[in-house]
Amino acid sequence: MVRQQAAAEAIEEDRRFPKLSLGLHLDLGEWSYRDGEWRQVYEMVPADDMVAVEAEILRQIELFRQLAGRDPTHLDSHQHVHNQQPMRAVFAKVARNLGLPLRNFNPSVSFCGEFYGRGKGNPFPEGISVENLCRIIRSLPAGITELGCHPGLDAGLDSDYCAERSEEVQTLCHSRVRAELDRERVTLVSFAELPLAG
């Protein structure tokens, strides 16, 4: 999210690990679920104005380029707005024009969301355990699967999914997980290595 305070620091950290993917998490606004209903926290551009949406996407890509000195390896969006029409078509057009993968757009890539520390909004620590991740690895289908995860180490993050992020880091880096990947002959790849969707 290039408009966030820590963007420059995150990109600087990325330079230490050049093999990692560095995607652009496009931010068009945020909604929060409170007291049984969704409420808008902020909006970058009107969600029903596709010309404004495209212009904002391009602005954020340009800001990413200025900060990183290169294109992102892939695109996605905050709160998955790129999965919903009519925005999906705009995101797809921009990604296609730039030759960048767009998350959840390539039919040859399946998605696994089972590695998550919440279940129906409540804490679910078993979801981010070493045992669960090893089970997921054993049950992966042939082909390419994206594992949805939210690892992080910022204890001061303003999020209701904060402690779980450091647990995810510990689990993802655990030696038993590495051994399971090797045993199941799973090769980790970055978004930069994925085929583009037509």
Name each region found by the language model.
Residues 79:
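Active-site histidine-anchored catalytic micro-motif
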Residues 2-21, 27, 32-68, 74, ...:
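Terminal accessory/targeting
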